[in-house]
Structures are given as C-alpha cells and as structure tokens.
Amino acid sequence: MRTHLLSITALALTAFGAVPAAAQVNGVGVTDPAIAIAGSQALQAAYTQIGTTYQAQRTQLEQLQGQRDALLRQFDTDGDGQMNEAEQQAAQANATVIQQMQALDQTIQQTQAPIQLARIYAIEQIAMQYGNAVQQVVAANNVSLILSPGSVVYAADAVDLTDEIIARLNTLVPTVSASAPAGWQPQRQSVTLFQEVQQLLLSAAVQQQQQQAAPAQAPVQGR
C-alpha cells in the first residue's frame, strides 16, 4: 500500500504534462486534491493502520470475492477469465446462482463498510487542511492561477504544484485519526475524494505490476 501511495505523484507528473514547481514559476499551477491527499504522510500512515486494524475483515473479503469468482467461473465456457455477453446471460438465467451472488454481494458490502468509513474519515481530516496548504503554496510561488487536470487541454508552461502541496499538508496535518467516531457521517465531497483516491491507488498498483512484469517478458539477447 505504501508503495502504491508513493507512486501517485509520479503518475501525476505524467498525467499533467507539467514540470515540478522548483523548475520554474510563471503564475500558472496544476494540481489535483486527490493526488495531493493520497501522497500525504498522514494518509499513508492512516491506511497502514486501518489495514492492520481490519486485517480479519480484509482476509474475509478475499475469501468472499474468491467465492463470487468461483460462481462466475462456472459460466466462463471459453475459459478466458472474462464474462462475455452470452456467459453473463447464462449466469443471470440461473436463479440459484443469482441468489448466491446477491447474498455474497451484500456480505461483501457489509464487510467493506467499516474499512471504507475509516478511510473516508482519514481523507476528510486531511482535506480540511487542503485549502490552507494551497494558499501557502500560492503565496510562496506567486501563483495566480491553479488548474485541475480535467481543465487542462494544453499548458506548456504549467507548474506542477503537487509535491509542494503535499509538503505543506505534511506540516499542517502530520497525523490523523484512523477511527471514525460513533455515528459519524462523511461529507459528500469526502466520499468523492475517497473514490478518486482509490482509483489512483488502483492505477498505481497496475502500473507497478506492469513494470515488474516487463523484465520477465524482455527477450533474451546474445544467444
């Protein structure tokens, strides 16, 4: 998990097509709240603690997902590991399988709930300081405009502010609680941020797997 989190800022530089803030400052910056929050030390520590606290639930989730995958494999007639339209229709026509999958999905959702709530709570605490971190970076770099990745079509001179914002977050909120209070309900923006962070983690994990697999797939030379 820590490796995935640390890979996120590298992904950000590629996605933005921007240079680090230390390289130049021209008044235009680019950053993304989810990437900055995901790269903060507080979230890395919180995710690690949450993973330890809910290790039993994570193990149960792996088992439940394995049971669900086994049900679907019954209908994977071509053995490609994917469910095409015909195979999906065959599975949906089997009432017993549908009932079993619905029961598994409900159990998976219930098991995931406390883990997700703890992660969202950690993210929300950091997000509360994100605005302050941005303001400090803006003042330090004389930035007049900050763009999000989704709003950038082309910006040759854009400055990536992500690393500086992460550094400010590390100072403003070095640690957060990884346990949500009883009855706590997250803000809608926090749920959205959580979903974005999870997608970033998935992308970082996929990229890491591809990089690790690349040497093994490289052709043998000199023979």
Task: Please give the residue ranges for each predicted region.
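Bacterial N-terminal signal peptides that target proteins for export
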Residues: M1-I8
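Hydrophobic helical h-region of N-terminal Sec-dependent signal peptides
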Residues: T9-L13
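Hydrophobic alpha-helical membrane context
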Residues: A15-F16, Q44
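N-terminal signal peptide c-region/cleavage motif recognized by signal peptidases
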Residues: A18-P20
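Amphipathic, charged alpha-helical segments and their helix-to-coil junctions
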Residues: A22-R223
